[in-house]
Design a protein with these regions (language model features):
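Small-residue (primarily alanine) positions within well-ordered alpha-helices
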Residues: 17, 21-26
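Conserved N-terminal/central alpha/beta ligand/cofactor-binding core
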Residues: 24, 30-31, 37-121
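A secondary-structure boundary/capping signal
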Residues: 12, 36-37
């Protein structure tokens, strides 16, 4: 027994990049299917990330943030809900081109599933 459904975009792999691709695709109006073999979305951020996984934020030579988008959106939502710590830059690396932001990976996974529902993926 089978059924047929048509999609505009099929994303294979629900790691961090696949999650971002599926959300972006749906937000741009494409009927999107995300396929993940493990049943848990997030890849390194969920299945093999250490407790208190850190977002590394990269900055350019002028000190402006280079990385943002959907992953940054997840960080901001987790921070607002109390499941992430504010970004931190090591005092001994004051001019470092990155900061760290620690999040709870279990809550990140829950948020990603919530975002999939919000976007109809």
């Amino acid at each position: 027994m089978g059924y047929e459904t048509k999609y505009d975009v099929i994303v294979c792999g629900g790691g961090t990049s696949g999650v971002a691709a599926a959300i972006a695709s749906a937000r741009n109006g494409a009927k999107t299917l995300l396929i993940e073999r493990t049943g848990v979305l997030g890849g390194q951020m969920s299945l093999s990330g250490p407790p208190g996984f850190a977002y590394a934020r990269l900055f350019n030579a002028q000190g402006k943030r280079d990385v943002g988008g959907i992953v940054e959106e997840t960080y901001q939502r987790l921070l607002k809900s109390g499941h992430a710590l504010p970004e931190w830059r090591s005092p001994i690396r004051e001019k470092a081109a990155y900061t760290f932001s620690y999040i709870d990976p279990d809550w990140w996974v829950a948020l990603v599933f919530e975002m999939m529902e919000e976007e109809g993926v």
